[in-house]
UniProtKB/Swiss-Prot annotation:
EC category name: ligase
Enzyme Commission number, as recorded: 6.2.1.1
Gene responsible for this protein: acsA
Protein's name according to its UniProt entry: Acetyl-coenzyme A synthetase
InterPro entries, per database record: Ac_CoA_lig, ACAS_N, AMP-bd_C, AMP-bd_C_sf, AMP-binding_CS, AMP-dep_synth/lig_dom, ANL_N_sf
Length: 660
């Protein structure tokens, strides 16, 4: 991997705005370096201090880190606490019960505000109801529910009684849901009659019934149904229960179950490169510490902020920066049921103005799709809305290409809001490498520097450090509290996937090709290792080619994959969405040549795509991620055999397959 070629030559740099720097928790690079040096000097002492300052413990911990069974690390093991107590009770006890915890905006625009006192009461009622159905400490509860206050309540209620939740995104198929219910050994399922997104309904209860009928789900004795739309559902008496009926007569008080620091808070499934999905298991204390700390550092959270993370609670971003991080610090946050393009592509910008959002966190895919819409229709351009409340904006989920970064900075951040381009993963629990809004000069396309206490590095295939400016593999050299503890039921897979013997067995393998800038040391993520192309012996990250394509004035979005080639070993195949209508015939051929030459000029002849296909869109999941594995099959001319249940736009596959 040391031969990966970094072809990003971004030199634009943006200093933190003076007003943000002056008021920031970490103000200036000297403050950042002081924290990083504290962690290097006394690693365990650094984390112990944060854990004592950030969390409220029922029983204080004595031992900080146990490395005796590496890589199955344990943090604060002899301490006891409760995540729900730290997210709710302590704020109410501090006199913040009337502070708004959640501003919920439904798909149709209806707005509901829930205070911390209200949320605590709702969580307690549901926790009591679950206990009466026999759910308790150590049980696993699968949650298959729309974006809703009820989803947050269900997660927090599980944490309150010591049950471990496993949230399944509301767009997954019955087969995918079944796999997760069986793998995790769930005893209860929480779902809804239907989901509302973009003016359309999805029958979640019917899908859940199909999953449970596939066999192997006998342990599921309770199915709780949240009535979202009032749609008709099949009913299994004795097993199924309406959420509103279940909690109607329950007490508003529920004593938290005090659990050990290492108690599994949740299991979240993430795709593996091969085989079945991996159930990533997270601890209670280490995870909660880090999502709270990164709210304070990355987002520079202040008590008067209105925070909005646009993710779904079915993904780790929604766990960390909706259900747990904001509530752990006592934040007011927006939670949104819908999609950014309904009823039009100005929805995000309108909501920022309506709710006076100060910190906004979304995905590059959403930004790119909204760029295309804004450039086609000024009515949905950010400049048509009041975004004056914003002070910090962020990105999550994938690297953001420099052109999209600049557009976001100029049009959404109005050239006055720092962008926190955050790199992290399901397995890391929270942010790992990111600018700090009041400290780090930002560079478009770079996630800049690791947070204090995160010992990230770039190494070759043998685990040896590579010089700055030379590409390699991103690793983390020391354990951190929020890291995943294991893969549920498969510790060997955990070791092989994340701590491979080829790297010595002690380095956390992130799986991303990365390069550090020669001068600044900034990290730039170049794409997954399996998204690295080997063309004529030259290794190129897909992000660089995509960035070059998107920098062309006609291109809105691009995704690049490889396919075997007899001459070059691997050929570059690009799928491109234009800012105008899709070309065909001779026009398409001429434009493909133009873009090939453009990439050759931007990067070099070696990176020229051999095949460019134009589509009206790219195949994406309902959470907005590009489904690159499908593009690889299309590029090779193979039939699509993979699970497409999470695909938002199935018709696009036929369109892209037709184009040659």
């Amino acid at each position: 991997m040391s031969a990966i070629e970094s072809v990003l030559h971004e030199r634009r740099q943006f200093a933190p705005p003076a007003a943000v720097e002056k008021a920031a928790a970490i103000s200036g690079m000297a403050a950042y370096r002081a924290l990083a040096e504290e962690a290097e000097r006394d690693y365990e002492g650094f984390w112990a201090r944060l854990a004592r300052e950030t969390l409220e413990w029922r029983k204080p911990f004595g031992k900080v880190l146990d490395e005796t069974n590496a890589p199955f690390y344990k943090w604060f093991e002899d301490g006891e606490l409760n995540a729900s107590y730290n997210c709710l009770d302590r704020h109410v006890a501090a006199g913040l019960g009337e502070r708004v915890a959640v501003i919920f905006e439904a798909d149709d625009g209806t707005v509901t505000r829930v205070t911390y006192a209200d949320l605590l009461a709702r969580v307690s009622r549901f926790a009591n109801a679950l206990k009466k159905r026999g759910v308790g400490r150590g049980d696993r509860v699968v949650i298959y529910i729309p974006m809703s206050v009820e989803g947050i309540v269900a997660m927090q209620a599980c944490a309150r009684i010591g049950a471990t939740h496993s949230v399944v995104f509301g767009g997954f198929s019955s087969k995918s849901l079944h796999e997760r219910i069986v793998d995790v050994g769930a005893t209860a399922l929480v779902t809804a009659d239907e989901q509302m997104r973009g003016g359309k309904t999805l029958p979640l209860k019917s899908i859940a019934d199909e999953a449970l009928a596939m066999g192997g789900c006998d342990a599921v004795k309770t199915v709780v149904v949240y009535r979202r739309t009032g749609g008709n559902v099949d009913w299994h008496a004795g097993r199924d229960v309406w959420m509103h009926e279940m909690v109607a007569n329950e007490s508003d008080a529920c004593e938290p179950e005090w659990v050990g620091a290492e108690h599994p808070l949740f299991i979240l499934y993430t795709s593996g490169s091969t085989g079945k999905p991996k159930g990533v298991q997270h601890s209670t204390a280490g995870y909660l510490l880090w999502v709270a700390q990164t709210m304070k550092w990355t987002f520079d959270w202040k008590p008067d902020d209105v925070f909005w993370c646009t993710a779904d609670i079915g993904w780790v971003t929604g766990h960390s920066y909706i259900t747990y991080g904001p509530l752990a610090v006592g934040a007011t946050q927006v939670v949104f049921e819908g999609v950014p393009t309904y009823p039009n592509a100005g929805r995000f910008w309108k909501m920022i103005g309506d709710h006076k959002v100060t910190v906004f966190y979304t995905a590059p895919t959403a930004i790119r799709s909204l760029i295309k819409a804004a450039e086609a229709d000024d009515r949905v351009h950010p400049r048509s809305y009041d975004l004056s409340s914003l002070r910090i904006i962020g990105t999550v989920g994938e690297p953001i290409n420099p052109e999209a970064w600049i557009w976001y900075h100029k049009n959404v951040g109005q050239a006055r809001c720092p962008i926190v381009d955050t790199w992290w993963q399901t397995e890391t629990g929270g942010h790992m490498i990111t600018p700090l809004p009041g400290a780090t000069p930002t560079v478009p396309g770079s996630c800049t520097l690791p947070l204090p206490g995160i010992m990230a590095a770039v190494v070759d295939e043998t685990g040896q450090d590579v010089p700055n400016g030379q590409g390699g593999i991103l690793v983390v050299k020391r354990p951190w509290p929020a890291m995943a503890r294991t893969i549920w039921g498969d510790p060997e897979r955990f070791k092989k996937s994340y701590f491979p013997e080829e790297l010595g067995g002690r380095l956390y393998l992130a799986g991303d090709g990365t390069v550090r800038d020669k001068e600044t040391g900034y990290f730039t993520i170049m794409g997954r290792i399996d998204d690295v192309l080997n063309v004529s012996g030259h290794r190129l990250g897909t992000m660089e080619i995509e960035s070059a394509l998107v920098s062309h004035e006609l291109v809105a979005e691009a995704a690049v994959v490889g396919r075997p080639d007899d001459t070059t070993g691997e050929a570059v195949v690009a799928f491109v969405v234009l800012k105008r209508s899709r070309p065909e015939g001779e026009e398409a051929a001429a434009l493909a040549k133009t873009l090939r030459d453009w990439v050759g000029k931007e990067i070099g002849p070696i990176a020229k795509p051999k095949d460019i296909r134009f589509g009206d869109n790219l195949p994406k999941t309902r959470s907005g991620k590009i489904m690159r594995r499908l593009l690889r099959s299309l590029a090779k001319g193979e039939a699509i055999t993979q699970d497409t249940s999470t695909l938002e736009n199935p018709a696009i596959l036929e369109q892209l397959a037709e184009v040659r």
